[in-house]
Design a protein with these regions (language model features):
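Terminal amphipathic alpha-helical/low-complexity segments used for targeting or macromolecular assembly
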Residues: 1-160
Length: 160
């Protein structure tokens, strides 16, 4: 389900108590909203500020070497962030700000993730490919594949 289509609710007093016991803190607990299936069980050592929305954590991630990690948020600061269902966010040295993190995302051992103001995340930007001198620009868009970029760069002047 898309994060924008989820139904959110305020945290209950019991959930806030559990989060506090798990060393979580918020500048304003009333700004934190969670999905109906949310459980605070997998949220530890997290600081919240601004408007934060959190999905449910039901899934485990299988990592190299046979390690399994349950989705959840641990050791992070979130500001104006929406976290989709079944994400694993761990060990964020500084913070994540002004982001919508899609479902099943895995973010670990990062310094800072933020966006300020309006951002296209590269959509519509032309980049030079195959030659540092230019002339083979490809416009980036969110569904661009390597195969499409190849055709755009090498066959751009052929009408068919």
């Amino acid at each position: 389900m898309d994060n924008t289509m989820m139904n959110y609710r305020k945290l209950t007093a019991a959930e806030i108590d559990i989060l506090k016991a798990q060393r979580c803190d918020a500048s304003d607990w009333s700004q934190i909203e969670v999905s109906d299936a949310f459980s605070p069980e997998y949220v530890h050592y997290v600081r919240f500020s601004g408007r934060v929305r959190i999905g449910a954590f039901r899934k485990e991630f299988g990592l190299a070497g046979g390690i399994r990690k349950h989705s959840g948020i641990r050791y992070a600061t979130l500001h104006n962030v929406t976290v989709g269902d079944d994400c694993c966010i761990e060990n964020v040295k500084n913070y994540i700000a002004n982001y919508e993190i899609g479902r099943d995302s895995f973010i670990e051992n990062v310094d800072i993730i933020l966006t300020d103001g309006v951002s296209s995340f590269g959509n519509g930007v032309e980049v030079s490919v195959l030659s540092e001198t230019g002339g083979r620009e490809v416009m980036i868009f969110d569904r661009l594949t390597a195969q499409t970029a190849y055709v755009m760069a090498l066959y751009r002047h052929r009408p068919e």
